[in-house]
């Protein structure tokens, strides 16, 4: 039986968790084995910019942070289950990658 590894990433963890819950419900409904969702470490991307563009005045800075949340789900990939997973509505903020393994 083939296995599928589903990798999900997003900057909005609420939407990411809702997609994970939908996939989990599909796996329970179809009765296939599933491992996950496994939370991976959150990446923090930081950018510091100077507020004053002309170089005059005091040195004050803005700090911008973006957090990227990731989840991994391993699931048995039978045809019926994969069709249901492909029909799940994925928000724009969530990126999904499906890798099939034998």
Curated annotation (Swiss-Prot):
Gene3D superfamilies associated with the record: Ribosomal protein S10 domain (3.30.70.600)
Pfam families from the UniProt entry: Ribosomal_S10
InterPro entries reported for this sequence: Ribosomal_uS10, Ribosomal_uS10_CS, Ribosomal_uS10_dom, Ribosomal_uS10_dom_sf, Ribosomal_uS10_euk/arc
Keyword flag Ribosomal protein: yes
Region feature Disordered, mapped onto this chain: 37-61
SMART domains reported for this sequence: Ribosomal_S10
Gene Ontology molecular functions: structural constituent of ribosome; tRNA binding
Record's signal peptide: none
Keywords, alphabetical: Ribonucleoprotein, Ribosomal protein
One GO process term, biological-process aspect: translation
GO cellular component terms attached to this protein's record: small ribosomal subunit
Keyword Cytoplasm recorded: no
The organism's place on the tree of life at top rank: Archaea
Chain's role: Involved in the binding of tRNA to the ribosomes.
Membership in a protein family: Belongs to the universal ribosomal protein uS10 family.
Subunit composition and interactions: Part of the 30S ribosomal subunit.
Protein name, per record: Small ribosomal subunit protein uS10
Organism for this UniProt entry: Methanococcus vannielii (strain ATCC 35089 / DSM 1224 / JCM 13029 / OCM 148 / SB)
Encoding gene, per UniProt annotation: rps10
